A protein has these predicted regions:
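Basic, Lys/Arg-enriched alpha-helical interface segments
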Residues: 1-67, 76-77, 87-120
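Active-site beta-strand-loop-beta-strand hairpin of nuclease catalytic cores
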Residues: 74-82
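Hydrophobic/aromatic beta-strand elements that line small-molecule binding cavities or substrate pockets
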Residues: 70-72
Length: 120
């Protein structure tokens, strides 16, 4: 029996933000998200710290002199939720900047609310 992919759920502007990135980044993130839909984890997907488990993952790609990130969650049984797609602009370290972490937390809450509503 063939595995059925989970649907992707785009929170807020994530799809528009992803499609505005360089084509090589869009392809790489698309591949990682496709793997997540089938219950697999892309080799370049890493758990995002501060979330306590491997349920919130981040994929990082470099292109055109910039660093791009996509954050998604596989915590919910009904779908893969894409929480944030952005270009990292901080010049200090590799940590995800606080404003982006705040966006991720807020969108994770929205995904949780949506998933709860889908189960009712």
């Amino acid at each position: 029996m063939e595995k059925q992919p989970k649907p992707l759920r785009w929170i807020a502007s994530t799809k528009k933000d992803l499609l505005a990135m360089p084509a090589t980044v869009v392809r790489a993130f698309g591949h990682a998200l496709s793997q997540a839909q089938f219950g697999d984890k892309a080799a370049n997907a890493k758990p995002l710290s501060d979330f306590g488990s491997a349920g919130v993952l981040e994929v990082v790609e470099s292109a055109d002199g910039g660093t791009y990130r996509a954050v998604y969650t596989v915590r919910f049984a009904d779908a893969v939720y894409v929480l944030h797609c952005f270009q990292k602009k901080s010049t200090q370290g590799i940590a995800t900047p606080k404003p982006d972490m705040d966006v991720i937390r807020s969108r994770l809450k929205a995904a949780e609310d949506h998933a709860k509503g889908a189960r009712k």
